Each structure stands twice: as structure tokens, then as C-alpha cells.
Amino acid sequence: MSNLSKLEFVALDISRKNYLSWVLDAEIHLTAKGLGDCIIDENKASIQDKAKAMIFLRHHLDESLKVEYLTVKDSLDLWIGLKGRYDHLKATVLPRARYEWMHLRFQDYKTVIEYNSVVFRITSQLKLCEETIKAEDMLEKTLTTFHASNMILQQQYREKGFQKYSELISCLLMDEQHNDLLNEKS
């Protein structure tokens, strides 16, 4: 029988692809529902709250995982079991994300949107592994990885004194759109 109630976020896949984002989503939703304590050691949550948390967590598991953890009745035990099974992913995701960040270059992307998307994918992976890239690091990464033929352009953007990464990206997007319009007219 299929689940008729709507999922608040994507269920945890048995293949472990979405574990890190699933953990974050589960923690946020449990906290919003007042059930965040149910997945913390030595919690004082009521039996009813633990049951609600367990229902919520099981509802957001792949069918195969539900079967595998069928006998687990406590939300904390389920949380610890899943953590033990999947938490090692940080050891594989973190080095790959660091490598991608180190080798990320603005010049390698055709559009600002494409570059920006990759920046946020990498920084999100790093953040999920408890490693944060600051806005000034994102600014510097972007400005220092312009193509060598665009050094004057890089200096012009640097002279604008952007304090936020989003401001730089907005400016780059606007300039890219203007450039596209000029190219269409010629």
C-alpha cells in the first residue's frame, strides 16, 4: 500500500545518495514540530513525542529501509542506527568537495548561472560536512579564477569593492545579459 500522506522532504534512499541532506531536513522538521529532542542522547521527551518522531522518521525512509529497521521502536535508536550506517559518507564527500573547491575556476563555465550553481553545490556539501566557506572566500575564488585574458575586467570588478558574493554574482549576471544582448544585435 502506498503512502497517501505527503512527504515534507525526500525520503532517505537506501543507496545513501541523499543521507547528508536528509539528516539536515529531518533535524529541521523535527525541531519545527517540537520533536527535536527525540533524537538527542539522554532526552527527556515524552513517550508520545518519541512515537510522533518515530512515525515522522519512518515516513521519510525508503521502503527497503523501513523493512530493515522494522523492529526498531525508538526514534533515537533509529537515528543512531542510520547514523552508524551512513555517517561515514562525510569521509568520502568532504575530500571530494574540497578537491572540487580547490579546482573550481570561474573561467571553466560558459555562464554565470552555471558557475554559481556549482559554487553552491560544493559549498553546501562542505557545510553538510561541517566545513564552511565564507562569503569572502567565494568572492576571492571568483575574482582570482577569471581567464587570464580578462585581467582588466577582474580588476574592474575588484575595484567595485563587493562585500557580498551575491552582489558580485548579480553584477556578473547583469553584465553577461548585456553582453548577450549586444552580441545578438551585431
Predicted regions located by residue number:
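N-terminal Lys/Arg-enriched interaction segments
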Residues: 1-186
